[in-house]
């Protein structure tokens, strides 16, 4: 649970009370805002074989953080939205009773979502590795100067960009930063990544969809000291000229509990409508 959400402690108490009615055993842990770490994570690691699923109370950022800990252990996540849009959440707070009843009856599905692996190579040595559900982003940082970089797919040269950066997104991440930068929306069942340049200095640049069994390599030609690789907007690493960023499919997938009989396109309509109301 994200402790920074005011509704969180109240909702948590309700869940704990209801869980006793359904003979569930719940263990309370927090995702800490900022560090996005799990308190007493060693204790969780020792007992992961006994965990059937994880309830995550928070916004999309909290869920993104949770996937990094629980996806490698193949533990499903049920998201309960305490944020604004809640695109990754399955339930709103008022649907807790409905959710627990469905879980108790075994009336749910587990949906797999592709995760990505991003590695940084410097002077032929690997210097960083990150995993994420949404995207890996090369960005220029605070100064208004462009980055020059080349993109390769499975060692096949694609093109060279002069741009503010580039986004490599999973289907899940295609509705996030990549969408704002002009990228297409991918159905989660599509086995692909989308490569979307950020403000490219050309009229011809477009986003590119590639199969997710391909390896994407970004070679940085010129960059500022503030240039960064960020993954899911929560992990970051400084990038220098000559660095290579290698992005491919992670060796595991995130697992999400699905309780409602709604398609991806229905969810997309609902969330985009909510986003429009929020911005209005």
From Swiss-Prot:
Recorded GO CC terms: cytoplasm
Enzyme's top EC category: transferase
GO biological process, one term: NAD metabolic process
Record: active site: 60
Single GO MF descriptor: ATP binding
Purpose of the protein: Involved in the regulation of the intracellular balance of NAD and NADP, and is a key enzyme in the biosynthesis of NADP. Catalyzes specifically the phosphorylation on 2'-hydroxyl of the adenosine moiety of NAD to yield NADP.
Cross-referenced HAMAP family: NAD_kinase (MF_00361)
Name this protein carries in UniProt: NAD kinase
Lineage of the organism: Bacteria, Bacillati, Bacillota, Clostridia, Thermoanaerobacterales
Name of the gene encoding the protein in the UniProt record: nadK
């Amino acid at each position: 649970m994200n402790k920074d959400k005011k509704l969180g402690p109240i909702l948590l108490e309700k869940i704990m009370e209801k869980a006793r009615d359904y003979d569930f055993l719940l263990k309370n842990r927090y995702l800490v805002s900022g560090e996005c770490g799990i308190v007493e994570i060693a204790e969780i690691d020792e007992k992961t074989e006994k965990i059937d699923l994880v309830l995550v109370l928070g916004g999309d950022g909290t869920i993104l953080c949770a996937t990094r800990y629980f996806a490698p252990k193949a533990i499903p996540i049920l998201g309960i939205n305490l944020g604004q849009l809640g695109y990754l959440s399955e339930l709103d707070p008022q649907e807790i009773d409905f959710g627990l009843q469905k879980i108790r009856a075994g009336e749910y599905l587990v949906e797999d979502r592709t995760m990505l692996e991003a590695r940084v190579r410097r002077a032929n040595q690997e210097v960083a590795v990150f995993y994420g559900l949404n995207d890996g982003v090369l960005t220029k940082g605070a100064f208004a100067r462009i980055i020059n970089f080349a993109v390769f797919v499975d060692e096949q040269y694609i093109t060279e960009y002069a741009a503010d950066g580039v986004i490599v997104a999973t289907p899940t991440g295609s509705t996030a930063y990549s969408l704002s930068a002009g990228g297409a929306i991918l159905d989660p069942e599509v086995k692909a990544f989308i490569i979307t340049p950020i403000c490219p200095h050309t009229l011809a640049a477009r986003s590119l969809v590639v199969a997710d069994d391909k390896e994407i390599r970004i070679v940085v030609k010129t960059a500022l000291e503030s240039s960064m690789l960020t993954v899911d907007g929560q992990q970051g690493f400084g990038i220098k000229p000559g660095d290579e960023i290698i992005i491919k499919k992670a060796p595991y997938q995130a697992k999400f509990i699905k309780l409602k009989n709604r398609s991806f396109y229905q969810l997309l309509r609902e969330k985009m409508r909510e986003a429009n109301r929020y911005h209005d």
